[in-house]
């Protein structure tokens, strides 16, 4: 008996130790902490320039550089590719801004807004459901999309850090000839060399202090990384054009699509690739594995997760459309020009910058450019979301939302124990534990499946746009997003909103034949099914948007149009409150007292 009591006491001490410190602005509960509460004005520091710098992290990445090469490899000409890029980027900017308004106007992220769509996760439902059904209850509502995102993000974290480690390996090989000549002490069955695993470990160590910074305090860091990334990629392009004495012949190569039908579908597929999936065709160099396939570009979560830091909604509007359309269209052109020049130099078009560095005779130039590429990869591993499309060889995964995104999702899942910082480190540890080189070498089917998840994520975009703009008409009751009492308008049926299920299923189920064919080409499907899968992102976006609007118009959810009378969480400025009709007299102390009461209620019901 004494042993049992002692064991229970140790568990209680451990439980108290892992809980977040309660000295923040918000009383901790199972629904809220400082990082997932509606952000107060003091934390909303992002200006237009911040958004330009933040989203430039992706636009100045190796992934975006190689996008043009992927489309040219699909038989489009360079200039047809650029038309597809500009049109695709324009559509992407529109979707990003529409979803970004959720965070910019109400200052909440994906895990919290998911409660409005799918239902609050009802920890306090012990009063209304049997205790033995706790597991089923916890998996209801907003937990589903959040768990899906976390799984994808952790895998993305693993692959992204591995790519960064390969860039570190290239730098060390350029600086230290002895490192380059180091004998490999690992067996072939390890699927990784000694040099590569050292570079991977160093990259993960470098990530630790970067992940420590809060998103609202990372502006200067991201600007510095963007400058180094842009300088490296610009330098590679200038060097290539200079040595080739021009852009070469590839830039003038005509399209291989001869009929108007095939050309039209090719351009449409290119636009779809830009909007929903972006490509990297990584070559078989010693430093970079050729792994990529489909991953959603416009994951609905990322936009509102970061737009909630905006000082005002207009900051995210200009910042995103300028970055998506202008900067996002320039880098694929740089990639096409460089590849055309390298074809004239080496007799082969090189689409992957690390490959160019690997064969460069200038060690100093390769090292400095490599540092820029590492900074780009490090920035991606911290903040951004990426995507890819069919590579010419091994299918894989790269650049899915990582770093801050996994921190925000885990914070939304377990707000009493995890904030953004802790979530980032949990994601880093889990990503390292996956040993990405093993997945790339021996789990081809797994990588293909996980990298094709854009078909499951794209409907979330349509559902978010429909729900916020057409159903709720941009009005939310924030206080009901942070409890699971039955009287809340987001409680629905036992914490679950069935209205979101059908639109999500319609958005991806018809794509399953093409999805299965992409994983196993031996599975034969019709041309129509294959084409529908190729256009999966716009189909998922538009179909889920239409069905969600129809279902909610026919079966309206409770509380449409309701908002809080008082500024419960101290969220709004005076101007925002006046525009919404919210009373600013309420204080954050009132909110804290309410949250403490709710926390006590949860404890009492569990006892």
Curated annotation (Swiss-Prot):
Entry's Gene Ontology molecular function annotations: nucleobase transmembrane transporter activity
Keyword Transcription regulation (UniProt): no
Source organism superkingdom: Eukaryota
Disulfide bonds: none
Region entry Disordered, spans: 583-607
Compartments where located: Membrane
Record's bilayer topology term: Multi-pass membrane protein
Role, per record: Transporter; part of the gene cluster that mediates the biosynthesis of aspirochlorine (or antibiotic A30641), an unusual halogenated spiro compound with distinctive antifungal properties due to selective inhibition of protein biosynthesis, and which is also active against bacteria, viruses, and murine tumor cells.
Name this polypeptide is given: Transporter aclS
Organism: Aspergillus oryzae (strain ATCC 42149 / RIB 40) (Yellow koji mold)
């Amino acid at each position: 008996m004494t042993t049992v009591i002692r064991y229970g006491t140790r568990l209680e001490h451990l439980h108290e130790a892992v809980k977040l410190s309660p000295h923040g602005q918000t009383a901790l509960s199972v629904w809220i902490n400082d990082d997932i509460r509606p952000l107060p004005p003091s934390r909303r520091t992002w200006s237009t320039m911040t958004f330009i710098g933040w989203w430039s992290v992706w636009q100045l990445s190796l992934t975006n550089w190689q996008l043009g090469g992927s489309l040219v490899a699909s038989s489009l000409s360079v200039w047809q590719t650029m038309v597809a890029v500009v049109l695709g980027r324009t559509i992407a900017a529109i979707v990003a801004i529409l979803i970004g308004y959720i965070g910019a106007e109400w200052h909440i992220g994906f895990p919290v807004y998911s409660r409005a769509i799918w239902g609050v996760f009802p920890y306090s439902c012990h009063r209304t459901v049997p205790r033995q059904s706790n597991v089923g209850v916890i998996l209801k509502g907003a937990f589903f999309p959040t768990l899906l995102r976390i799984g994808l993000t952790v895998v993305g974290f693993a692959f992204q850090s591995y790519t960064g480690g390969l860039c570190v390996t290239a730098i060390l090989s350029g600086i230290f000839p002895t490192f380059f000549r180091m004998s490999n002490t690992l067996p072939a069955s390890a699927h990784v060399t000694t040099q590569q695993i050292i570079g991977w470990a160093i990259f993960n160590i470098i990530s630790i202090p970067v992940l420590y910074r809060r998103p609202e305090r990372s502006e200067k860091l991201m600007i510095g990384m963007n400058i180094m990334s842009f300088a490296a990629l610009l330098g590679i392009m200038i060097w290539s054009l200079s040595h080739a004495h021009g852009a070469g012949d590839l830039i003038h190569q005509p399209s291989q699509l001869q009929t108007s039908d095939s050309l039209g579908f090719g351009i449409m597929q290119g636009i779809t690739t830009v909007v929903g999936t972006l490509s990297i065709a990584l070559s078989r160099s010693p430093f970079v594995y050729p792994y990529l396939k489909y991953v959603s570009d416009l994951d609905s979560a990322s936009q509102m997760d970061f737009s909630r830091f905006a000082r005002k909604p207009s900051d995210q509007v200009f910042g995103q459309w300028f970055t998506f359309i202008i900067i996002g269209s320039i880098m694929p052109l740089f990639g096409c020009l460089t590849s055309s020049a390298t074809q004239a130099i080496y007799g082969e078009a090189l689409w992957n910058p690390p490959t160019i560095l690997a064969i460069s005779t200038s060690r100093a130039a390769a090292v400095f450019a490599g540092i820029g590429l590492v900074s780009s990869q490090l920035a991606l591993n911290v903040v951004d979301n990426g995507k890819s499309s069919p590579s010419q060889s091994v299918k894989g995964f790269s650049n899915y939302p990582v770093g801050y995104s996994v921190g925000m999702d885990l914070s939304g899942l377990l707000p009493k124990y995890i904030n953004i910082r802790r979530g980032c480190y949990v994601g880093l540890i889990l990503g390292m534990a996956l040993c990405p080189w093993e997945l790339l070498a021996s789990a081809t089917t797994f990588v293909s499946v996980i990298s094709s998840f854009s078909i499951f994520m794209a409907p979330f975009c349509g559902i978010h746009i429909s729900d916020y703009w057409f159903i709720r008409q941009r009005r939310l009751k924030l206080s009901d997003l942070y409890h699971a009492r039955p009287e809340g308008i987001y409680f629905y049926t036992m914490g679950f909103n069935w209205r979101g299920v059908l639109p999500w299923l319609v958005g991806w189920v018809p794509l399953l034949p093409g999805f299965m064919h992409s994983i196993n080409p031996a599975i034969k499907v019709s041309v129509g099914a294959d084409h529908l899968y190729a256009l999966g992102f716009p189909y998922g976006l538009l179909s889920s948007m239409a069905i969600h609007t129809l279902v909610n118009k026919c079966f309206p959810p409770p509380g449409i149009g309701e908002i809080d009378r008082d500024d419960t969480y101290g969220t709004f400025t005076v101007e925002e409150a006046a525009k919404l009709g919210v009373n600013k007299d309420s204080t954050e102390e009132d909110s804290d007292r309410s949250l403490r009461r709710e926390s006590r209620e949860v404890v009492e019901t569990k006892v």
